């Protein structure tokens, strides 16, 4: 049954979060087929057109089963901010609902879900020349020195950020250099959310830790068999600037080093698996602390829980 079959157009969306390799895509496909839904991506790597296999984007066959939005629509050379994703997701949800379909937002990027349901600070776009100036300044600096520099400009952000969190430290420095205001000050002026939490069904897919580790390892091996290495080779041939987000996709740095002859294939695979497992652990921690009131379930129970909540 689709949304056209009922005037009770609640919920406005279904949100499905979960760690990598937990089975989110399969769950979303099953739910979308039952609800005449549209799957909307909330994964910060799957927005890029490069590395379809390595980032575990849905296959072309899966995308033919139900409509998919915000997958592979951004070139790897481009910057893609949370603000841009919010704008794209809001448009995709509005289009789905205008068509009488249920928006099903699925992914593992916690910041996307938080911004969607709690609002986003109105930080201006950072000019490219400012970004490059900050990056050049940081090239020869260790991260703890950058963290100390941030403490003189934005003490509140420095307290909140780990001294080794180089990417977020650089982001905070860029905001200060571009706007003259601390990032923490911008964040206090958060806009109203695009989607109120109470208007959505919110679900976290959970998998037992050892089971998830095994799934991650097997999936990485399957990706290698499916052509992930060739994808990385094509991406490397583009010679993108080193700070492009897509170059940090889990497994890409290790496979790039293998292609350069700097490590063995077996070591590259092991490092890619380890990197992905560490990321999954961070995701699980995020979902536990940032989404305490979301529904939870396993791959065995999730579909029944969601369809029961939606009264299908």
Swiss-Prot record:
It holds the Pfam family IPPT. Substrate binds at residues 20-25. Its EC number is 2.5.1.75. SUPFAM superfamilies: P-loop containing nucleoside triphosphate hydrolases. Residues 43-46, 167-171 are annotated as: Interaction with substrate tRNA. Keywords: ATP-binding, Magnesium, Nucleotide-binding, Transferase, tRNA processing. ATP binds at residues 18-25. It comes from the Bacteria. The keyword Nucleotide-binding applies. GO terms for molecular function: ATP binding; tRNA dimethylallyltransferase activity. GO terms for biological process: tRNA modification. It catalyses: adenosine(37) in tRNA + dimethylallyl diphosphate = N(6)-dimethylallyladenosine(37) in tRNA + diphosphate. Its cofactor is Mg(2+). The record marks 109, 131 as: Interaction with substrate tRNA. The keyword tRNA processing applies. HAMAP family: IPP_trans. Belongs to the IPP transferase family. PANTHER family: TRNA DIMETHYLALLYLTRANSFERASE (PTHR11088:SF60). Monomer. Catalyzes the transfer of a dimethylallyl group onto the adenine at position 37 in tRNAs that read codons beginning with uridine, leading to the formation of N6-(dimethylallyl)adenosine (i(6)A). This is tRNA dimethylallyltransferase.
